[in-house]
Design a protein with these regions (language model features):
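Alpha-helical transmembrane segments of multi-pass integral membrane proteins
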Residues: 35, 197, 225-338
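Membrane-interface helix-loop-helix regions
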Residues: 16-41, 80-147, 151, 256-267
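Alpha-helical membrane-protein architecture signal
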Residues: 34, 70-74, 136-137, 195, ...
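Transmembrane alpha-helical segments and their boundary/interface "anchor" motifs
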Residues: 41-46, 50-53, 57-100, 106-117, ...
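Functionally critical transmembrane alpha-helices in membrane proteins and complexes, commonly lining
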Residues: 1-62, 84, 289
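Structural signal for the C-terminal ends of transmembrane alpha-helices
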Residues: 58-65, 94-99, 156-165, 201-211, ...
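Membrane-proximal cytoplasmic C-terminal regulatory module of class A 7TM GPCRs
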Residues: 279, 337-374
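Aromatic-enriched alpha-helical transmembrane segments of multi-pass intramembrane proteins
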Residues: 3, 12, 27, 114-259, ...
Length: 376
C-alpha cells in the first residue's frame, strides 16, 4: 500500500520507472537505493507474501491435518475469487465517482490508470484473475500466481514430501531456476514467481528443524538475521544505485527469495518478532490484510486524481493510509468475512456429504454373514 501511495507522486513515480535524471537528495537516494527501500517495497513485498503463503497453505498437510481436496479447492477458490471480483466492482465504482484523466508531468504509474480501460468489460475479464482488469485494479497481477499455486498445490506437496533428505538441494534448485530463468528463459520471465511458493512449502515440511535452529540463535543475533534478510530482499535497488544496467538485477527474485524466507523464519522463531506480530493492532491489520490489499489501489488512485497529484508526499502518505485502512476494514466486514463464512459452510457441507456417502457404502452390521465367517 505504501508503495502505491509513494509512486502516485510525480517525482517518486519517475524514480520507480528509473527515468528520473534530476539530482536526488541524500535522503531520497537512501530511501530508493539502500535497504531503507524496504519501507515502501512493492514487488519485494509480494515475494515475502508468496513465501508466507506457501508456508501457511502447506503446513496443515505437512502435519497430516489438511482437508480433503474436494473440500480444499471450493473453499480456497471462494475465498480468493469472491473478494477479488468484489474489489473490481468497487474499483469501477470509484471511476464513476472520480474522473481519471492524464495529468501533465504526473506520475507514470498514476497516468497509466487514466489511459487504460476501466469499464464493465474489465470487471468481466479481470474476474478470471489471470488478466484483463485494465486500469481498474492492477494489484491483482500478484493474485494470479496465488490462484495458480493453489490449483497446483498437490504437486508442490508431493515434491516437498518426496525424499526429505534432499530438501536443501531442492531449495538450491528453486533458487537457481529463479536466477537463471529471467536471464535465459524464452517463455514468460515472470514464471519464476510461482517457484517462490515452493520455498514456503519446504519451510512447512521442515518446521521442526527450523524451530530447533531458531532456538540456538542468541537474541542479539536476530537483528543480524533481519538486516541480512532486508539487504537480500532489496538487492535489486541496491545494485541499481550503483549500476542500473547490471544484468544481475534480472535475477533479483532469487536473491530476494532468500531474504523473504529469512524474514518468515524470523517470524516463526524469534520471540521478540512473535510478540510484535501478535500485538493487537498488528494482528488486526493482519486480519484485514487481504481486504486492504484488494482495495488500497483504487483508494490511492482516486485520492491522487482528486488532488491532481498535487498533495505533497509527506501529507499524502498518512491521508491515503488512513483512508485505505478504513475502506479495507469496511470491505472486510461486508465482503471478505461473509465470503469466509460461506466458504466454511460449503466445506462443512461437502465433508458431511462425503461422510454420509462413506457411511452408506460401508457394510451393514446386520448383513448376512459369509459362509465360514461364524468361525472367526
Amino acid at each position: 500500500m505504501v508503495f502505491h501511495i509513494v509512486i502516485s507522486d510525480a517525482s517518486a513515480g519517475r524514480v520507480y520507472k528509473l527515468d528520473h535524471n534530476a539530482p536526488m537528495s541524500t535522503w531520497a537516494y537512501a530511501l530508493n537505493y539502500t535497504p531503507l527501500r524496504v519501507a515502501w517495497a512493492g514487488s519485494e513485498a509480494v515475494v515475502v507474501f508468496y513465501v508466507l503463503s506457501g508456508f501457511v497453505l502447506a503446513l496443515p498437510f505437512a502435519r497430516s491435518r489438511g482437508p480433503s481436496w474436494r473440500v480444499f479447492y471450493p473453499r480456497r477458490l471462494i475465498r480468493l475469487y469472491v473478494p477479488a471480483i468484489a474489489s473490481l466492482i468497487f474499483a469501477w465504482i470509484t471511476t464513476l465517482i472520480v474522473h481519471r484523466r492524464i495529468i501533465s508531468g504526473g506520475s507514470p504509474w498514476l497516468n497509466h490508470h487514466a489511459s487504460e480501460p476501466t469499464g464493465p468489460m474489465q470487471i468481466l475479464l479481470g474476474s478470471s484473475l489471470m488478466a484483463g482488469w485494465g486500469g481498474l485494479n492492477t494489484s491483482l497481477w500478484s493474485l494470479r500466481w496465488e490462484v495458480m499455486f493453489s490449483l497446483l498445490l498437490p504437486i508442490f506437496l508431493i515434491l516437498a514430501a518426496w525424499c526429505s533428505r534432499w530438501d536443501l538441494g531442492k531449495a538450491v534448485v528453486v533458487l537457481l531456476f529463479c536466477a537463471a530463468w529471467p536471464l535465459v528463459g524464452w517463455f514468460y520471465p515472470d514464471l519464476v514467481y510461482i517457484s517462490v511458493f515452493s520455498l514456503g512449502v519446504l519451510m512447512a515440511y521442515n518446521l521442526d528443524a527450523l524451530s530447533n535452529a531458531a532456538s540456538r540463535i542468541p537474541p542479539f543475533a536476530w537483528g543480524i538475521v533481519v538486516t541480512a534478510s532486508i539487504v537480500l530482499l532489496t538487492n535489486s535497488w541496491i545494485v541499481a544505485g550503483v549500476d542500473l544496467n547490471n544484468p544481475a538485477r534480472r535475477a533479483w527474485i532469487a536473491i530476494a527469495s532468500i531474504g523473504a524466507a529469512g524474514l518468515v523464519w524470523v517470524a516463526i522463531g524469534c520471540r521478540a518478532a512473535r510478540r510484535l506480530l501478535s500485538h493487537r493492532s498488528i494482528a488486526w491489520l493482519g486480519g484485514i490484510s487481504f481486504s486492504l490489499y484488494l482495495t488500497q489501489e483504487p483508494v490511492v488512485v482516486g485520492l491522487a486524481f482528486v488532488s491532481g497529484g498535487r498533495i505533497p508526499l509527506w501529507l499524502e502518505v498518512p491521508l491515503a493510509f488512513v483512508a485505505a485502512v478504513l475502506v479495507g476494514w469496511i470491505f472486510y466486514r461486508l465482503v471478505e468475512r461473509p465470503s469466509h463464512r460461506f466458504a466454511r459452510a460449503w466445506g462443512s457441507k461437502r465433508r458431511s456429504a462425503a461422510a454420509g456417502l462413506q457411511q452408506s457404502s460401508a457394510p451393514s452390521r446386520t448383513a448376512v454373514p459369509m459362509p465360514g465367517s461364524e468361525a472367526t
